[in-house]
């Protein structure tokens, strides 16, 4: 019916009367056809009718509203779902209460932010269209409930975050109608040329992509990770299936750092193998950064930092034959919010039975952060040749000298062959040579 019924009836004089509380809730009838009646093409005087108007046994009702039984006509319009959806967050707090929509003590426990201005739900994530639809009405209803003393906070939501759209190619035929994107082959649909557009993925543009194919090819964790890695969460981002391979490889490398694929055995060393000092510092820099990035919803940057740490673990495995448990376990815990299925499997392989959901996020070692040097990979014309360790305050000239003094770099290039040294602070140093 596109919404909840108004608890209103009309008397014989067509005057509205509220249904008393003892007769609530008003239950909607079961009907065979929910479609509304629209204007008749051949009758200019016709009027549209809601589907409830055809439920005559429900519409005409005899009620005793305090002055004896009388016949009334029920309101056949409905509230367009706002009445139910605008306060759902309050009902979620106390869904089993059959006397109140929420217990006041329960509402205060969850919604009161300890004196912080506004209070309300900690975080609301929704599209920008919600601002003029659901959020507008939810805020109105909440303020009414606050004025009536039923809720403890003047605002329903403490923080609002608008996520961007996922965009995909959409196609229109010569007359401008959208055609199924999946059925376009070589720029044509059923033999006709089409025009390509980039638009919001969805039914209206017929350019939706089923996640089932991604699940089958790469698994659910890869899809989750790819969506978070596409770019800032609040930006519109184009769907690029070829990029899925990159995050899939990250998860594969993480798996291989923990599990020997030939034997199926865990390849993580016990407490006897300590991480190198640079790897230990990088671990705690990553913990500190990813903790903050998760709180800021900057998942794409967090994935980049986790990838860098995992690459460092890969090099450690290559050089020393095993991954240090002291690094791998925090890495798995940090990956868990993004790739929960793989993380849970790895956690069990590491010998743990406790669910990851019950564990605290890793804590960074303040000393490692305070004295942290910066480890920079060094490439020559884009090819990795080693890494250097510099102080966190090292200037460009110091980084340049250290990079050019690195053994493999010094053997490959002389000072006269260096065209320029590109330093991306905290990330990489690339030595570009003259042709």
What positions do the PLM features span?
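Structured secondary-structure scaffolds
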Residues: 1-262, 279-314, 326-335, 431
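Basic, alpha-helical terminal appendages of large translation-related enzymes
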Residues: 30-81, 86, 95, 201, ...
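Membrane-interfacial helix termini and the short, flexible loops that connect transmembrane helices
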Residues: 150, 269-273
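Short amphipathic alpha-helical leader/targeting segments
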Residues: 174, 178, 212, 268, ...
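A broad, low-specificity signal for short, low-complexity segments enriched in glycine/proline
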Residues: 215, 268-270, 339, 393-394
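C-terminal, low-complexity/hydrophilic appendages and adjacent surface loops
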Residues: 264-266
